[in-house]
Amino acid sequence: MLAQLIMLIVMCMQRHWLYAAMLAPSLLGSALMLITMIMRVRHEETNSNTITGSDSPVPTHHNGNEIDHAQLFADMPSISFEHLHGLDNDPLIWRTIVRNWLVRSPTNGIGMSEHGIFHIDLASSGPHAMVAGTTGSGKSELLISWCMALAIRHSPQTLHFVFLDFKGGSTFNALERLPHTVGNVCDLDLAHAVRALNAIEQELARREALVSAERVSRFDQLSHPPARLVVVIDEFHALRDRLPDYMQRLNRLASLGRSLGMHLIVCTQNPMGQVHADMKANISLSICLRVTDQMQSNELIGTKDAALIPPAFPGAAYCHDGQRTVPFRCSAVHDIDSLVHAINTASAFSGTTNPSPLFSAPLAPHAGKDDLTAPQREAWHHVPFALSDDGVLISTAF
């Protein structure tokens, strides 16, 4: 372009107007191309600055071109669940919980991010979630904190839990005592697990019938909507491997749960190939704690970052809701027994009746009179004499 400009000047000085006229269009085209390139570069620089600005959830701590994960999570406050919710110095925690139940906040704080308290709204961001993390990553603590955050914000009249733990641990033992809990399988008893899955299927059908009978499209449009049901499954791969024939029932739950108020939280150590494509298509909320392989992290959140979380930060995780990925640190519950007691006290003060179990353990070989339930209304023909089992619940036969 510079050579063309010099030649044009020479032609003009020598008054060779014909040659100058021939050079002018070419010179003008080159100038326009240069201007276009400059504008494009400036536009790309502006977009780059916008994406990595202060309002972006992308981490801002870098060492060269790599995120300094240790510094990233070290800068996030590590506080207890009680302190996060202002309960650590509360002399009457149950009273605060009752107040929370009356407000019914949709969001639930479970930890701290770079910009403050990290909240999750399962109903709008989900309605289902997948949680992954290797041993020692803090997965159990995150599940407990998440469920406790739900329990202190929603009363047993509006929220129920079902817990299925297939690693034979004690993750949900304390949560079983919550007034919200309507079922818990905390061992490797497959017969008990089958009853739980049958009960979930029956509840799904019951809610479908309610919605159909009132000719509405969503459960919250019902005149008397049932409580939301959150089904938490730990070590999902064990359930899939041992009861593969029942996976279709959970696929239906994932497909229809949004409109019926039923939510699924699937937990595993390795997210690679653990969830059927039909179920995965309905899971839009992913939380990845530390994993051992970058492919596992990419599978869940679309980046390798979760595989680079230092082991010194249990509870550190990335949350991906389909649009953005946010790093956060989970706030672990310090005294779960005291908190569960406060929730039960709040339930008793509110006068709420604990929900009936959704399922029970299989019928024992022998039953005593203490296992029988007296009829609510005395009648000469209501004489309890045995226990009956319909494959889901055990009840007293009259």
Describe each model-derived feature in a short phrase:
Residues 12, 34, 44, 60, ...:
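Surface-exposed polar/charged interaction patches
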Residues 43-65:
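Membrane-proximal helical linkers
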Residues 65-107, 114-117, 125, 130, ...:
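Conserved P-loop NTPase motor module
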